[in-house]
Design a protein with these regions (language model features):
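Actuator/coupling domain of P-type ATPases
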Residues: 4-6, 16-27, 31, 74-76, ...
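Alpha-helical transmembrane segments of multi-pass membrane proteins
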Residues: 20-22, 37-63, 67-77, 96-97, ...
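Hydrophobic alpha-helical transmembrane segments
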Residues: 60-96, 103, 198-294, 449-452, ...
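Membrane-embedded transport module
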Residues: 226, 479-505, 510, 520, ...
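Cytosolic catalytic regions of ATP/NTP-dependent phosphoryl-transfer enzymes
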Residues: 291-427, 434, 447-448, 463-468, ...
Length: 738
């Protein structure tokens, strides 16, 4: 164990070489191996790989074109995710948690992951404890262990008692001896459970996972039927043809690219927000913010700049102002001073004239701190706590609070300090008014949320009149203001809103906001927030600007809107394939397409346009019912396309699949045009390019031979007739739904 001066540089180096470093597993980033594993070794890739092998065995390599698309999707998804990961990791590194340690007798600020075993770590109110350890010294040290025990009440920590990583300091200060770091720490050993506690719920990911499960079950149930049907129709003459036709139908059920597009969409949103100084710590948070119905904000640092200015003292009961200034300087002379105490310290610098015998640190629950000097004990805190019965003092407090000032009372007692208890003899000595500047962008940001139908509540530990004055200045209704709320009351208020079915975002910067941030659907911290606050937040505003939230909501809406559009297309294709497989089984017909033709349709009418739709702009307001809207459109649209394809194929003079391919291509491009509205220049260019490529596939001899198209007047007319009828049905379905 290190000496009181901490480890030496040589001892630190020795432990680093031994691997006794606090390297932590991040919950927001995946390794390259993990990215490769999740993009390559998937159930759908395994199925497509097996189908590709079946095609290779038939010798019809051209029909294995979907294998190249599979590789392209995998490479694209891996490359995009790796690029986004590196971008986000660089930003996270710049804003990674820090800790104070004593090394070579000097208090040093280092990244928390650089702590080594046996380091002496200095902790104070608001700090997130990064390692397991034993308390060496305690100055009224209180730790919240709710992450580990579920108990919200802070625990007083004395010398020789243990503290654990993942907890945070609510009051006081102290030093600890790091006994377990990195994977050996308690919090890291229960990481899986800890992650469950804070991960945001993603409706999008839930819906996509359900769609993928539906498609997988469709494949497993219909694969035997498809193979049996095609062997029954063509097997006697040509098992290779039966295999190829079987694969064509089954490939259509597989949602090539849907998982990749979902991941890319979330990542591009996170990268875009990082450029706007918003760090996304959990990807689903982007979507969650767009679904928010209630926004709860803290006053200080969110509605105000957090920069405080202390007004001259309002002396009470004939106390000597010079002595009061010395007392305030001594009270503010605290390494763990919060913004309020720092403002007091700047106004009344410590002169060292006071001999401090004992002190009690500030606690957001009791709302006061105290020191004992030769002249008695001095208490600084909330007026209604320190002087709850003095009507004249409370009236002065009310008058000052109505101006928007934060008001503190300095009170004196001749008796010595009693730990965490107020004396019976306590006389008001002075009122201190501290003013904060309201953010210039706060009113516009609040108006934006109100226009979007989001209810806004202010939850603050300040005097209700102070909070109400600031709320009025930015346009928040007074009945939505809650003052003098404790951390537990903030948490309980969030829980109460949840019982009404609200989706809640909570912003905060203090350790008193941690419990509420964890209960909210999405917690948002300012960059100057306490380490514990940033540790539990899903988003961090890196420059502390509240005005970035509308941008984040726009990105969330883009994610939801774009993935909904993409899901419509993929599910319609799945339904078409399922309907076609069942229909040809009933009618004892060969499947209408070859695998290469399905690949052409999937690429030009689904894969490429879906990619551009997934990264495009979309500012539509969120409304519940993602899955129901997708099903209400995609199911009838897919059935309509499948019906048209089967009818057209049976009516065609040959079994080349040309007419069916034209029908399906045009129909799916019509779906793309429906969800690309209103057209932007980019969408118009993309759609026009895809149409030209489709025309080339049916008009250039080399391509028609490759795709086995029989381009005759009859096939073209039949295909166009089927596609026009289907496009009309799709348009009607879309208009009815909207």
């Amino acid at each position: 164990m290190g000496s009181p001066v901490g480890l030496t540089s040589q001892e630190v180096t020795t432990r680093q070489l031994q691997g006794l470093v606090n390297n932590l597993d991040t919950k927001t980033s995946r390794s390259l191996a993990h990215i490769l594993r999740t993009n390559v070794f998937t159930r759908f890739n395994a199925i497509l790989g097996a189908l590709f092998i079946a095609i290779v065995l038939t010798g019809s390599l051209a029909d294995g074109l979907f294998g190249l698309v599979l590789v392209a999707n995998t490479v694209l998804g891996t490359a995009q995710e790796w690029k986004a990961k590196r971008t986000l990791d660089r930003i996270r590194l710049l804003h990674s948690p820090t800790s104070h340690v004593i090394r070579d007798g000097v208090n040093q600020l280092i990244a928390s992951h650089e702590i080594v075993q046996d380091d002496v770590v200095v902790i104070s109110a608001g700090d997130h404890i990064a390692v397991d350890g034993v308390v060496l010294s305690s100055e009224n040290l209180e730790v919240n262990e709710s992450n580990l025990t579920g108990e919200a009440d802070a625990v007083m920590k004395l010398s020789e008692q243990r503290v654990f990583s993942g907890t945070f300091v609510t009051a006081g200060s102290g030093t600890i001896h790091a006994t377990a770091v990195g994977k050996e720490s308690y919090a890291q050993r229960i990481t899986a459970e800890a992650k469950k506690f804070t991960r945001p719920v993603s409706e999008i990911q839930d819906v996509v996972n359900r769609l993928l499960a539906w498609m997988l079950w469709s494949f497993l149930l219909l694969a035997p039927l498809q193979v049996w049907t095609q062997l029954r129709v063509d097997g006697d003459r040509n098992w290779q043809e039966a295999t190829v036709r079987s694969v064509a139908g089954l490939v259509g059920i597989i949602p090539e690219g849907l998982v990749v597009l979902t991941t890319i969409t979330f990542l591009t949103a996170a990268v875009a927000l990082s450029r706007q100084q918003v760090l996304v710590q959990q990807l689903p948070a982007v979507e969650t913010l767009a679904r928010v119905s209630v926004l709860c904000v803290d006053k200080t640092g969110t509605l105000t700049t957090g920069i405080m200015q202390c007004d001259p003292l309002l002396v009470l009961n004939s106390y000597d102002e010079t002595e009061l200034q010395d007392v305030l300087g001594a009270l503010a002379d605290d390494l763990a001073a919060n913004a309020t105490l720092q403002a007091i310290g700047q106004k009344f610098p410590s002169t060292q004239a006071m001999h401090v015998i004992a002190h009690i640190p500030f606690d957001s629950l009791k709302k006061w701190k105290a020191i004992q000097v030769d002249s008695g004990s001095w208490y600084l805190g909330a007026p209604e706590i320190l002087s709850s019965t003095d009507v004249s003092v409370l009236r002065k407090v009310q008058d000052l609070a109505h101006t928007g000032a934060r008001v503190l009372l300095l009170a004196h007692s001749p008796t010595p300090l009693t730990q965490n208890a107020l004396p019976s003899q306590l006389e008001p000595a002075a009122l201190i008014a501290i003013k904060e500047q309201v953010r210039q962008d706060a009113a516009l940001t609040i108006k934006y949320f109100c226009d979007q139908g989001v209810d806004i509540y202010v939850l603050s530990g300040d005097h209700p009149s102070t909070v109400a004055a600031v709320a009025r200045a930015v346009g928040i209704k007074e009945d939505h203001v809650r003052g003098r709320v404790t951390p537990e009351e903030k948490r309980d208020f969030i829980e109460q809103l949840h019982t009404r079915g609200e989706v809640i975002a909570m912003t905060g910067d203090g350790v008193n906001d941690v419990l509420a941030l964890k209960k909210a659907d999405i917690g948002i911290a300012m960059d100057n927030a306490a380490p514990a606050t940033k540790a539990v937040a899903e988003m961090i505003l890196l420059d502390g600007k509240f005005s970035h939230l509308p941008t984040a909501i726009t990105e969330g809406r883009r994610v939801i809107g774009n993935l909904e559009r993409v899901a419509h297309i993929f599910l319609a294709k799945n339904v078409m394939s399922v309907f076609s497989i069942i229909s040809v089984a009933v009618l004892s017909q060969p499947f209408p397409f070859l695998p290469r033709q399905m690949t052409l349709m999937s690429t030009l009418a689904i894969g490429i346009p879906a990619f551009f739709l997934a990264i495009g702009k979309s500012a539509r307001r969120y409304s519940p019912g993602f899955l129901s809207r997708v099903l209400q459109f995609s199911f009838p649209a897919g059935v309509a396309i499948g019906c048209a394809v089967v009818v057209v194929d049976i009516s065609a003079p040959d079994d080349s699949g040309t007419a069916a391919s034209i029908t399906a291509l045009v129909a799916f491009m019509w779906i793309v045009s429906v969800f690309a509205r209103p057209f932007t220049a980019r969408n118009a260019v993309v759609l026009a390019t895809l149409i030209i490529l489709a025309i080339c596939a049916f008009s250039i001899e080399m391509l028609t031979e490759f795709f086995s198209f029989s381009v005759t007047t009859h096939n073209i007319a039949l295909g166009m007739a089927g596609s026009f009828c289907t496009a009309g049905v799709i348009e009607v379905i879309h208009r009815i739904q909207h």
